[in-house]
């Protein structure tokens, strides 16, 4: 089973039922593409995101119709809700009043101090954190005049400007993002931010692109950032169905052992030795394990000679041969199965492992409760 790597120490911030930062696992976030005022469409998309593994969802809040929809949306979903606000402090107040779990707004863009104070007061009263979102493409004019073009230094300076406004009002439930479409710039900005302050960081590569190119760009950039222990929430920005963003985020986190509730697939690239339809089998198993909330590593390999040895790290797997397959656990052969039964037998073994994992988790929870009572 995969081990969870804890992130760099950051200040913990509560967002609804979740804690962001403070050595907790990296949380997956996405954003709806519906018109927020269309409650039914928005809720339906959020339910699809939840099913895919999204843990926090953000909605655009560009006008009063969107802000008015917040209470009904909140009532019908199961994950924390974030309202994305630009400039209009009244929309922030309405979203907070409507029960949103977090707002994304830059206090320096709201206007007069009394407007900022009103938002901070409302956020404090309801325990709603604020995410400061710095974007390389929309840095303040004074920052661009100082540095000439978007730089990591300028992005961190912009973040600190907004942070200090909130800190002066004794508000510290802050999360920060420093996004850029340039991967190297994003990496440098997040590195500098991590050295500069201890607020949780929401990481992402903005405007990454289409499903194919955006996935690669995000994996390269966020992989580099996560490998340094930086990042507390993650969002993949794709010109695609937001469910795809969640799938990509889960795969990236699984690669680093940062997803405690996701199964992983290992499959070989195929070669002339293969006697089974490995590609279709691998795709079927990948779809099957996508919704399994247990850290199981599954292998689908085409060669019975090298397969078990190549997948010693896998919890369970199959290696194909002509007319049959080898079912193995941790590199040791369990039994042979006919080719036509390989997939179903593997699915049964995956289900058994998942049940074992959930049973152990329940035992741990019961033991912890027992210790607490004593």
Curated annotation (Swiss-Prot):
Top EC group: oxidoreductase
Catalytic activity, EC: 1.17.7.3
GO biological process terms on file: isopentenyl diphosphate biosynthetic process, methylerythritol 4-phosphate pathway; terpenoid biosynthetic process
Entry cofactors: [4Fe-4S] cluster
InterPro entries assigned to the protein according to its UniProt record, in alphabetical order: Dihydropteroate_synth-like_sf, IspG_bac, IspG_bac-typ, NO2/SO3_Rdtase_4Fe4S_sf
GO molecular function, one term: 4-hydroxy-3-methylbut-2-en-1-yl diphosphate synthase activity (ferredoxin)
Protein name stated in the entry: 4-hydroxy-3-methylbut-2-en-1-yl diphosphate synthase (flavodoxin)
Organism: Geobacillus thermodenitrificans (strain NG80-2)
Gene: ispG
């Amino acid at each position: 089973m995969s081990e969870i790597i804890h992130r760099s120490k950051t200040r913990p911030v509560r967002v609804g039922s979740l804690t962001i930062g403070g050595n907790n696992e990296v949380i997956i976030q996405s954003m709806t593409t519906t018109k927020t005022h269309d409650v039914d469409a928005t809720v339906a998309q959020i339910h699809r995101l939840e099913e895919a593994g999204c843990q926090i969802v953000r909605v655009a809040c560009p006008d009063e119709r969107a802000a008015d929809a917040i209470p009904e949306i909140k009532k019908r979903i199961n994950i924390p809700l974030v309202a994305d606000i630009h400039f209009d402090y009244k929309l922030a107040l309405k979203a907070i009043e409507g029960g949103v779990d977090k707002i994304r707004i830059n206090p320096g863009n709201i206007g007069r101090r009394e407007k900022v104070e009103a938002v901070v007061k409302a956020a404090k009263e309801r325990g709603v954190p604020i995410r400061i979102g710095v974007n390389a493409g929309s840095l303040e004019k004074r920052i661009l005049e100082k540095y000439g073009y978007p730089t990591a230094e300028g992005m961190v300076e912009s973040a600190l400007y907004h942070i200090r406004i909130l800190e002066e009002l004794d508000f510290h439930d802050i999360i920060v993002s420093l996004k850029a479409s340039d991967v190297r710039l994003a990496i440098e900005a997040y590195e500098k931010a991590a050295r500069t302050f201890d607020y949780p960081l929401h990481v992402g590569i903005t405007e990454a692109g289409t499903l194919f190119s955006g996935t690669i760009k995000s994996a390269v950039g966020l992989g580099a950032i996560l490998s340094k222990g930086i990042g507390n929430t993650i969002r993949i920005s794709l010109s695609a169905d937001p469910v795809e963003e969640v799938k990509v985020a889960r795969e990236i986190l699984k690669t680093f052992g940062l997803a405690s509730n996701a199964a992983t697939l290992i499959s070989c690239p195929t070669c002339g030795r293969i006697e089974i339809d490995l590609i279709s089998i691998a795709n079927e198993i990948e779809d099957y394990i996508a919704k399994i909330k247990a850290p199981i590593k599954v292998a689908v390999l085409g060669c019975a000679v090298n397969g078990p040895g190549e997948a010693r790290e896998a919890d369970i797997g199959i290696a194909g041969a002509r007319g049959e397959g080898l079912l193995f656990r941790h590199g040791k052969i369990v039994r042979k199965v006919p080719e036509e039964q390989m997939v179903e037998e593997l699915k049964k073994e995956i289900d058994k492992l998942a049940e074992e994992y959930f049973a152990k988790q329940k035992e741990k929870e019961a033991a912890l409760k027992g210790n607490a009572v004593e």
